Amino acid sequence: RPVKRPIDCVEILARVLKKGVKTRLIMVGDGSERQNAEHRARCLGIYDQCTFVGKQPRIVDYLSASDVLLLPSEQESFGLAALEAMACEVPVIASRVGGLPEVVTDGETGCLSPVGDVDKMAADAALLLSDEKLRREMGQRARESAISRYRTDVVIPQYIEFYEQVIAKQSV
């Protein structure tokens, strides 16, 4: 979908490669923008560093093998993809939109940027991809955050309390 800004991922990869960082982009998912992203990769001469795998039933397999997750969306309600990556010890490079700032702590569990700021996202990606110690530490903090804040034994009581408050207000 256009709001996910997959072409930004290709632009970010091009900038990271220009900085001399050896890496590749694995893009998971199908949608109306996939062909445009593939076309942009060809135009930039980086198609060979991109793998477009389409929709996948087990995203965790790809997240577990990733160094970073790029999430340059212009809209994001909660940020489930970010949370899934964090649970796999993968730092998230994302737009500062929707629920993402609630999930990703800038500079601690990932990096947040304004929507469309591919230069900053590329700089963040290049730094994390070229500094294994920093990437590993950020990934560990990401996992700790995901587990401590979003475990079922933490979240379910919060939902129960919320619904009890709603029901109590309706009874009055």
List the predicted regions and their residue ranges.
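A conserved nucleotide-sugar
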Residues: 6-52
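An anion/phosphate-binding loop that grips the pyrophosphate of nucleotide cofactors and donors
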Residues: 66
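Short hydrophobic beta-strand element within catalytic cores of glycosyltransferases
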Residues: 91-94, 104
